[in-house]
Amino acid sequence: MARTKQSARKTTGGKAPRKQLSAKSARKGVSPASSAGAKKSRYRPGSVALKEIRRYQKSTDFLIRRLPFQRACRSVVKECSNATDIRFQGPALASIQEALEVYLVGLFEDAMLCAYHAKRVTVFPKDISLVLKLRSRHVKSISD
C-alpha cells in the first residue's frame, strides 16, 4: 500500500448534536443531566490531606511564596522604622523566610499535639494560644 499525504479536513467547529430523548423517557421524568453522565468520583475524606502531607514532607522548597513574603517584610520594616528606602539582600530575605517557616511548622506541630490531647484532629485557635502561652512560660523560666 502506497503512502500518501493526508489533506486537512474541514471541521464544523462545534460539539456533536445531542440525541433527543424519546417521548417515553421524557414522560418518566428522567433529567438529562443525571442520565447523561456518571457521578464524578471523589477521594475519600482525609486521603487528599495525607497526599499533601507527604508532598510537603518530601519537598525542601519554601512553603510561602517569595514575593508575598518579601512584600510583607517590607511593610513590617516600614511600620517599625522611619526609613523610606530600605533594601534587602536576597540571602537575607531567604534566611528570614527559612527561620519563619521553621518556627511556624514547629508551632503547628505543637498545636497538633494539643489537639490530639483534647481528642480532636482539628487545630483550633485555642490550641495555638495554649502553645504560645506554654512557650512564653518556658522562656521566662529559662531566663530566671
Swiss-Prot record:
Q: Which residues carry this modification: N6-methyllysine?
A: K5, K10, K19, K24, K28, K39
Q: Which InterPro entries match?
A: Histone-fold (IPR009072), Histone_H2A/H2B/H3 (IPR007125), Histone_H3/CENP-A (IPR000164)
What Gene Ontology molecular function terms does this protein carry? Answer: DNA binding; protein heterodimerization activity; structural constituent of chromatin
Using the record's annotations, give every residue carrying the modification N6,N6-dimethyllysine.
K5, K15, K28, K39
Say yes or no: keyword rRNA-binding present.
no
Q: Which UniProt keywords apply?
A: Acetylation, Chromosome, DNA-binding, Methylation, Nucleosome core, Nucleus
One GO CC term on file: nucleosome
Q: Which Pfam families match?
A: Histone
**Residue list for modification N6,N6,N6-trimethyllysine:** K5, K28, K39
User: Where is this protein found?
Assistant: Nucleus; Chromosome
* Region (Disordered) location: 1-45
Carrying N6-acetyllysine, the residues are K10, K15, K19, K24, K28, K39, K58
**Post-translational changes noted in the entry:** Mono-, di- and trimethylated to form H3K4me1/2/3. H3K4me activates gene expression by regulating transcription elongation and plays a role in telomere length maintenance. H3K4me enrichment correlates with transcription levels, and occurs in a 5' to 3' gradient with H3K4me3 enrichment at the 5'-end of genes, shifting to H3K4me2 and then H3K4me1. H3K36me represses gene expression.
User: What this chain does, per the record?
Assistant: Core component of nucleosome. Nucleosomes wrap and compact DNA into chromatin, limiting DNA accessibility to the cellular machineries which require DNA as a template. Histones thereby play a central role in transcription regulation, DNA repair, DNA replication and chromosomal stability. DNA accessibility is regulated via a complex set of post-translational modifications of histones, also called histone code, and nucleosome remodeling.
Q: How does it assemble?
A: The nucleosome is a histone octamer containing two molecules each of H2A, H2B, H3 and H4 assembled in one H3-H4 heterotetramer and two H2A-H2B heterodimers. The octamer wraps approximately 147 bp of DNA.
Family of the protein in this entry = Belongs to the histone H3 family.
Protein name, per record: Histone H3.1
Q: Which organism is it from?
A: Encephalitozoon cuniculi (strain GB-M1)
